[in-house]
Amino acid sequence: MSKKRGRRHTAKEDSNSDYETDTYGLADGDDKSRPYYLVEDLPCSLEPPRYDTFTYPLSVKDSAVLYSSLLSSRRTWVKGEMFQLYWAKQYMNTKEKEELKKEGIDPDSIDQSAAREKMNKLCDCMMQGGPHQFPIRLFILKNDEVERAWNEAKEAKKRDREVRKKQQEEEKRLKKERKLLRKKLKQEALEKEKEKNKDKVKKPRKPYKKSAKRLEAERLKKEEKAKAAANTSGVKKKISKTSNVKKKKMKAVVRPKPYEEQVMILNLNKMARNDKQLNDLMIKVAGGQASLAEITQFKKYIEKAKAMPPPSGTWKPMLEEVEVTDDGESDEDVKELEVTEKSEDVTPTEVALPKAAVAAKEVKDVVVTPNLPPGTENSGNGKPPSLDESNAQESTDVNKNQPIQRLNISKNVQSVKNDITENTDLASNEHMNEKQVQKTPESTTEHKPDEKPKDAAMSKSNEKKPDEDTAQDTSKDDENKSDKSDSDSDSDSDSDNDSSSSDESDNEDNTSQTKNSIDNTDDGVTSEKADTNTDVSSDKPPDDIKSEGEVAAPRVKRKYRRRSKVKTEEEEEEEKAMQLTTFQQKYSNGADMVFEYVENANVRFLLPKYSILEQLEGEESYLLSFIVVHNRREVALFTTRKLKELNKKKNKEDHIKPEDYNPFEDARCPDPLFSSITLKLTGIPKKFSNIILNSFHPQERVQLYMKSIIDRGSRLSGYNLWYQLDAYDDKELAERLRVGLKEYEQTFKSKRQKKQIL
């Protein structure tokens, strides 16, 4: 019975061994006669020590309490009693080694390699805890979930790259197909167009018969006009004589006006500003309402203006438009035809001009700008009349007793506006007029005694570029010849008649288009300038593009690229030093940190996840604060039992993990006995700062956990060490402490020194 009772008693003790209270180093059977307790074989008390109670107190050195306490504290840190143990090297006894040898396994080859492979070294650093400094090694603990997530992300990126590559290849293929299709369609369109052109049959031209019909029709018209002009005026014959010449379209060419005429016009305008009577007279003459006496008086003003010197200030010569043939015929041929026709068609019944017409002839081509009141301007189309139009206008003026119709005010407004741009247009306009200037014979000058010689500067500039002008004009003639239609002679004659009638109707519309003419002339000048500039630039080489008065093209701004900053060797070394390995990049967030003491490499501990981490200024040092629960053994037993109850009725996927469960929120949990610890980690490279900072729980979660411990538990009170002992009453304790220090010193001495001591 005694044996059974003994067995039951031992079994009961084993079952209750897990729930035994921890003494936390307090020695059993302390001597109540002494004023202190023995904790870890060191004299401690809750109250401050009272050394005056000793009869024969020993010194601090002889008592050996201070040095023993430092040694005990360092051993406590190295054993990691405040950290959670993760891995420890296992030692096998002789029986286990013999069994492994029988199985053919070398016991020395078995090391906890599987556990070691799960830990990847991060760096070496220093830990400062209390008065101690420990060199430690930091490790990253491998996590299967992190590895799986990394591999999935890597595969997803790889799939995205493949999809993107396929899309790019497909886009390239489609682009190539579209390009080939466009090319094919273009070729088909060209082939169809060629076939259509081949199918077209060109109508054969009958130049001799058509021209004969046209000449016959024009000759009949000319005879009719000559008969009508014989009764009214001899000037009418010019229209019929030039009708043969006016076969083809005319184009306007700008030429400079005579210098004396421009000076006279400017002086007249200047006099009209100061003399109101002259201004009114100019308005009457321009409107065709002046009498013969007023015209005679106006002639005196003209003579006076001619005698005056040029006005002071800067002014530039004006240009006038002269119509020339647009086809390959030269002006010389046109003038010869006019002269021959005039000699043939002159009749003895030519009537002399009246005095009013003679006066109008002398005053014609004088263009003045009187100071008109608003709303009384004479409108014009901004285009000076040609030679035939001016002759026709003179004849109609004589019939209507209105001698002067060519004083066009809107034309003068145009000339004032064009003075600004004439300098730049001069070179291009001269380029267009060079052919007509060279081919005009002396007979034309005899036929037109009223025309004055051109300006000397204009003639010189025209003489500089004969070859270029001829090349340009020949190209234009070719274009005009290619643009001729293949219509019949009747349609050609009708178009000529229509063009002549449109030219005459233009003069009649001058009085109703004053404001529009000013704007249109401005636009026309600018467009003409652009056309002439493009023609000159296309014909000339790049070096000869700039001419007198022509504005140079704006210089293209040069694009500058910023130079990439050249990195020094130090910066390159810093960049290399800041680079992380692939494994370290995986665990840049949520890593589990493990460390080992260099003094005790057989054991590795986990850094507590419920810690508050603070990075210091140097970015290589950190303050780590956490709470140590001294009765964590009792709390751990309660946690495992409680999790079993909670997960019993749940699926495996819904099980609560230990790291997600806070036992201190349960009222049945044992009250924690805790103390706070703060340590310092130094010497951690900057590149690992993200890994270190993100390896702990968020600060809000840690604060809630610590608050639950502080609210439920009680802080462990500190003990006060007695650094002095009594020589007689504490003789054995002091001797034991001194012997322990002596033995600890012997471990640092060599074998030779040990033999000498022995």
Curated annotation (Swiss-Prot):
Keywords: Activator, Chromatin regulator, Coiled coil, Nucleus, Transcription, Transcription regulation. Residues 1-10, 175-185, 199-212, 235-253, 555-565 have a biased composition (Basic residues). Residues 351-360 have a biased composition (Low complexity). Residues 153-174, 186-198, 213-227, 336-345, 444-487, 526-549 have a biased composition (Basic and acidic residues). Residues 323-335, 488-509 have a biased composition (Acidic residues). The keyword Chaperone does not apply. Residues 151-233 form a coiled coil. GO terms for molecular function: ATP-dependent H2AZ histone chaperone activity. GO terms for cellular component: Swr1 complex. Residues 388-427 have a biased composition (Polar residues). The keyword Transcription regulation applies. Residues 1-34, 153-253, 323-577 are annotated as: Disordered. InterPro entries: Swc3. It is found in: Nucleus. Component of the SWR1 chromatin remodeling complex. Component of the SWR1 complex which mediates the ATP-dependent exchange of histone H2A for the H2A variant HZT1 leading to transcriptional regulation of selected genes by chromatin remodeling. Involved in chromosome stability. Belongs to the SWC3 family. This is SWR1-complex protein 3. It comes from Kluyveromyces lactis (strain ATCC 8585 / CBS 2359 / DSM 70799 / NBRC 1267 / NRRL Y-1140 / WM37) (Yeast).
